[in-house]
Design a protein with these regions (language model features):
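Short secondary-structure capping/junction motifs at helix and strand boundaries
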Residues: 8-10, 26-37, 67-68
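Short, internal active-site loops enriched in acidic
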Residues: 39-44
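Helix-start/capping segments and mature chain N-termini
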Residues: 1-11, 15-22, 45-232
């Protein structure tokens, strides 16, 4: 992301990892979130920012669950956002740039006003893209998974991890374009993300889904993988 944004980060990956671990230890965080951020300084206050200094900060805090734990069992409800993911030739879509989250915030706020937990976003062509802060998967009647091709949104680490888990269980995973009108054909749906982890979805607008055994099993396998404890 930094390279795509033209940021020359003044620290190595190892230095940032060491600093992150120190902060986690000093804050006594056991189940939380780590967020490193980088930004340009104020040396140039104009569109051009070639001479600005790159700053880095790391924040961490205890964060048990991104969604209400009860909703993670029953499945969360999504509406379909009026805002769309931008076309890939209009913005560096494959970066963790804060500006890309503006439409996500607007979409989530509108969803919450309507009584939903989150919002499903479409891409510039009207295909299913992702939720406001997580990737999305669907399960069909044959037990196979379908997930949008990440060509206008981030291919999340959790997304790739879950795909790997699914394949290890001999579950077929199709990465493809998905039309909104296909949603009624699926029997299950879930989100994946660093904060969302594996979260079942009970409905998207008028489309209903079941929290099926496949989703529960994938979540349990994911939890086992990311919460491995070192032997004493």
């Amino acid at each position: 992301s930094a390279k795509r944004m033209g940021f020359d980060i003044p620290y190595s990956e190892e230095q940032i990892n060491i600093a992150s671990n120190k902060i986690i230890a000093s804050q006594n965080v056991e189940n939380g979130y780590v967020r490193p951020v980088a930004w340009r300084g104020s040396e140039m206050m104009a569109i051009s920012a070639q001479q600005t200094k790159i700053h880095v900060a790391i924040a961490t805090w205890e964060w048990g669950s991104y969604f209400d734990p009860k909703l993670k069992v029953e499945g969360i409800k999504l509406n379909i956002s009026n805002w769309r993911r931008p076309a890939p030739n209009t913005i560096p879509w494959d970066t963790k740039a804060s500006g890309l989250y503006m439409i996500c915030t607007l979409s989530k706020h509108e969803a919450e006003k309507q009584g939903y937990t989150d919002s499903l976003m479409l891409d510039h062509e009207g295909n299913v893209a992702e939720a406001t802060g997580a990737n999305v998967f669907f399960k069909d009647k044959n037990g196979e998974l379908h997930t949008p091709t990440p060509d206008s949104f981030l291919d999340g680490i959790t997304r790739r991890t879950v795909i790997g888990i699914a394949k290890s269980k001999n579950i077929k995973v199709h990465e493809r374009k998905i039309k909104p009108e296909e949603l009624s054909n699926f029997v299950g749906c879930f989100l994946t993300g660093t904060a969302a982890e594996v979260t079942p979805v009970s409905c998207i607008a008028e489309n209903q889904f079941k929290v099926c055994d496949t989703i529960i099993d994938l979540n349990e396998s994911y939890q086992t993988l990311v919460r491995k404890k070192k032997a004493a």
